[in-house]
Amino acid sequence: VNQAFLISTGAVALAEIGDKTQLLSLVLAARYRKPVPIILGVLTATLINHAGAGALGAWLGSMLTPTIMRWALAASFIGMGLWILVPDKLDDEEANTNRTHFGVFGATVVTFFLAEMGDKTQIATVALAARFHDFFGVVAGTTLGMMIANVPAILLGDRFAHRLPTRLVHGIAAVMFVVLGAMALFGVGV
């Protein structure tokens, strides 16, 4: 296993803790109660999003000197660290997937892809691909990191949604999100 893959997996899995896409995974699971198409939708959206980000990063890496890339990577990691301190919020438009005609899988792909646009994990993917010059290792690693962070949220949302009213599950998810945001804000456990 190569360095680009391992670092990409770890960086994105950590960056996803408390992120709005993790909350989105929980909300989608609670709403639809169909974990398999949601997991496949998250995987598909992540592969598409991170492949584009990885391609941009690989191109930037070929255009810039190693010194500039080292500084850019350092700045992106410091920026991600600061970004984690700012709690994300799940916009109503991102969470509102009831009006779609694409089914659970399609709703998940579209919603998750849009939620990831400009997100810290997408920016990390660009920076990592530029630094390591390993498109496949970075995209595979960042995708695995996303799945490590989001599949448990989907399974948790699905499991408890059967026992609890959806409204209560959404409330619990909101509280979890606020707690994770506060932890990130104060640097406790994140």
Locate the predicted segments by residue.
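Juxtamembrane transmembrane-helix termini in multi-pass membrane transport proteins
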Residues: 2-65, 124-144
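Short hydrophobic "helix-edge" motifs at membrane interfaces and signal-peptide entry regions
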Residues: 8-10, 106-110, 155
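Selected transmembrane alpha-helices and immediately adjacent juxtamembrane segments
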Residues: 94-122, 128
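Hydrophobic/aromatic residues within the transmembrane alpha-helices of Major Facilitator Superfamily
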Residues: 13, 17, 47-48, 82, ...
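Hydrophobic alpha-helical transmembrane segments of multi-pass membrane transport proteins
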Residues: 144-153
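Juxtamembrane boundary at the C-terminal end of a transmembrane helix
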Residues: 182-190
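Short, structured loop/turn "capping" segments at alpha-beta junctions
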Residues: 86-92, 120-124, 136-139
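Membrane helix-loop-helix hairpins that form the core translocation module of multi-pass transporters
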Residues: 3, 33-97, 103, 152-163, ...
